[in-house]
UniProtKB/Swiss-Prot annotation:
The lineage of its organism: Eukaryota, Viridiplantae, Streptophyta, Embryophyta, Tracheophyta. The keyword Cell cycle does not apply. One of the components of the core complex of photosystem II (PSII), required for its stability and/or assembly. PSII is a light-driven water:plastoquinone oxidoreductase that uses light energy to abstract electrons from H(2)O, generating O(2) and a proton gradient subsequently used for ATP formation. It consists of a core antenna complex that captures photons, and an electron transfer chain that converts photonic excitation into a charge separation. One of its GO terms (biological process) is protein stabilization. The gene is psbH. Belongs to the PsbH family. This is Photosystem II reaction center protein H.
Length: 73
């Protein structure tokens, strides 16, 4: 037999930890969906700003944007 049950060692349920107690409120909304679009527009704006930020960093790295007074060695 592959599994074996030991007498008197029944599991009483999940263990409670301090970390679990602290994170419990973050999981209390699990399965609930905000009506309508929710925060989708905010996420779209955040993604657009992040893409602009990355393109600025790339342009600086490629020296396609010249910065006055800063020497690139």
């Amino acid at each position: 037999m592959a599994t074996q049950t030991v007498e008197g060692s029944s599991r009483s349920g999940p263990r409670r930890t301090i970390t679990g107690d602290l994170l419990k409120p973050l999981n209390s909304e699990y399965g609930k969906v905000a009506p309508g679009w929710g925060t989708t527009p905010f996420m779209g704006v955040a993604m657009a700003l992040f893409a602009i930020f990355l393109s600025i960093i790339l342009e600086i790295y490629n020296s396609s944007v010249l910065l006055d007074g800063i020497s690139m060695s």
